[in-house]
Amino acid sequence: MELLSTPHSIEVSNITCDSFRISWTMENSDLERVTHYFIDLNKKENKNSNKFKHRDVPTKLVAKAVPLPMTVRGHWFLSPRTEYSVAVQTAVKQSDGEYLVSGWSETVEFCTGDYAKEHLAQLQEKAEQIAGRMLRFSVFYRNHHKEYFQHARTHCGNMLQPYLKDNSGSHGSPTSGMLHGVFFSCNTEFNTGQPPQDSPYGRWRFQIPAQRLFNPSTNLYFADFYCMYTAYHYAILVLAPKGSLGDRFCRDRLPLLDIACNKFLTCSVEDGELVFRHAQDLILEIIYTEPVDLSLGTLGEISGHQLMSLSTADAKKDPSCKTCNISVGR
């Protein structure tokens, strides 16, 4: 049987967090003969591994020939925000069950995308299921080392400046390494209604009245839901003043929450005053997208311990947790 030509001019398009479309060019004489495609997909750092030594052995992905471009989809082998290399081979399945195969095409590289809004909506729904009842609170707080606040006063005009979010949480979160903001907490002790006296982030705490950051002029977005191989679960929320740069970033990427009615963090008017509540059973990480003036709050030293084991800095999400994972790339 006549040999197959080698596929060439590989094109990868329509890339999402767990799928892509691929097409290539092959000789017209092969179009009617080819019955299968072999697709060799590798994470970029391993792009030279796992090439099969024998031309007649199928590679990782085997697909029946379909009109191109074809969609490759599967969260079991594709992860978001990950660089891959891909090469293809065409084949004709013969009557004896063996394959006549072409040579390998050139290798091309691409990077998968972030979670889309519909994926984040699935995470949001999972987080809502364990959020628990709502508790009242009155302040947002941020713990850090004394030198951090001294630097803000001396070199930043008494302002806490937004910084780039790290890679903690879900690997597919569109905020990681992209959104600038100032991190705050709001969780309170069940028995006192006050912020806890322990913190993993430093012994100095800046507290600011909740209404300074969260009010009807603020948009609230759901950004992530994760755990770190422990029983604790974290939800990341974004507070962005309406029309701000951070608000424009979030608008196209994150689910928007009703500030007065959601399962995580609310601001509502009761008896003519703003009342704030947070979910009891989630540790909330709040990202405020604008600079924060230290003169709007108070700074003091906490009496508890610095619990480093609870730090979420660059924390990796547990990919096996059924509570906080969805059926797309982790």
UniProtKB/Swiss-Prot annotation:
GO biological process per UniProt: protein localization
Annotated glycosylation sites: N14, N325
GO molecular function: protein tyrosine kinase binding
This protein's GO CC annotations: cytoplasm
One Pfam family linked to the record: fn3
Start and end residues of each Fibronectin type-III domain: 6-115
Keyword hit for Glycoprotein: yes
Species the sequence originates in: Bos taurus (Bovine)
SUPFAM superfamilies xrefs: Fibronectin type III (SSF49265)
Protein name: Phytanoyl-CoA hydroxylase-interacting protein
Domain of life: Eukaryota
Keyword list, A-Z: Glycoprotein
Family: Belongs to the PHYHIP family.
